[in-house]
Amino acid sequence: MSEFNITETYLRFLEEDTEMTMPIAAIEALVTLLRIKTPETAAEMINTIKSSTEELIKSIPNSVSLRAGCDIFMRFVLRNLHLYGDWENCKQHLIENGQLFVSRAKKSRNKIAEIGVDFIADDDIILVHGYSRAVFSLLNHAANKFIRFRCVVTESRPSKQGNQLYTLLEQKGIPVTLIVDSAVGAVIDKVDKVFVGAEGVAESGGIINLVGTYSVGVLAHNARKPFYVVTESHKFVRMFPLSSDDLPMAGPPLDFTRRTDDLEDALRGPTIDYTAQEYITALITDLGVLTPSAVSEELIKMWYD
């Protein structure tokens, strides 16, 4: 048997299921690790999970989201180790319940859509930054409920995620227009609310997300427009950044080294940023509608209850 590679396993799960989020793929990979590695003691299991988690985080750029999944799985393991006297039963329990957790987490978007649909009214114009599966699930659910609304989608450079969301909304028959990121300030007074997803939700209630989210949050705040974060609770992560400078980045936010004459290839910069809690109206999650200050309470429940 070839040596187990946590990174390759993680990437394979993402490739096989395009709807899977990074935290869930991380948990799936760690469950697979336990099944293959078969540690002989609790201490060996914890060390194996820790070392594999560190390896995975180091190997994946923008690892905030998968870090949340690794944290959740470690918490799950630590809380369940003492429940069984028999080690073999303990291992089997962790594997089976890890898979059960993954199954439930995959359904969280449906729950978010059911909760969040009350935030969309007839004739709303909704600004969306980037492509979030949770946001799309909510918008699709609202359209299926025959709520008449329109969407303004940012292009979301450099990833151009907005193009993907624009195409999906068009296919669903939802009226939508695509704008460049720099046009948000020009249209913010014409929209009714803003929806964004999240790569991770920090302990403070602020969010780590696609670059440009912070700019949209500031503009929405100044224009007194509601700014809603639509996200799964398994993206709550034990981090407390004060600004985007505190985020784990693949490279420096500003790089003046010239590497190419192609302007498109020369386009560089951060891929994620941090939006502080004061710009966020509420978080629409599978746990319900939360204020930013409630996130730390939920993390405490997750880790210490």
From Swiss-Prot:
The keyword Transmembrane helix does not apply. The modification Phosphothreonine is found at T291. GO terms for cellular component: cytosol; eukaryotic translation initiation factor 2B complex; guanyl-nucleotide exchange factor complex. It holds the Pfam family IF-2B. SUPFAM superfamilies: NagB/RpiA/CoA transferase-like. GO terms for molecular function: enzyme regulator activity; translation initiation factor activity. Disulfide bonds: none annotated. Its main location: cytoplasm. Disruption phenotype: Inhibits GCN4 derepression in glucose, amino acid, or purine-starved cells. The keyword Cytoplasm applies. The modification N-acetylserine is found at S2. It comes from the Eukaryota. Keywords: Acetylation, Activator, Cytoplasm, Initiation factor, Phosphoprotein, Protein biosynthesis, Repressor, Translation regulation. One of its GO terms (biological process) is positive regulation of translational initiation. It is found in: Cytoplasm, Cytosol. Component of the translation initiation factor 2B (eIF2B) complex which is a heterodecamer of two sets of five different subunits: alpha, beta, gamma, delta and epsilon. Subunits alpha, beta and delta comprise a regulatory subcomplex and subunits epsilon and gamma comprise a catalytic subcomplex. Within the complex, the hexameric regulatory complex resides at the center, with the two heterodimeric catalytic subcomplexes bound on opposite sides. Present with 8970 molecules/cell in log phase SD medium. Belongs to the eIF-2B alpha/beta/delta subunits family. Acts as a component of the translation initiation factor 2B (eIF2B) complex, which catalyzes the exchange of GDP for GTP on the eukaryotic initiation factor 2 (eIF2) complex gamma subunit. Its guanine nucleotide exchange factor activity is repressed when bound to eIF2 complex phosphorylated on the alpha subunit, thereby limiting the amount of methionyl-initiator methionine tRNA available to the ribosome and consequently global translation is repressed. This is Translation initiation factor eIF2B subunit alpha.
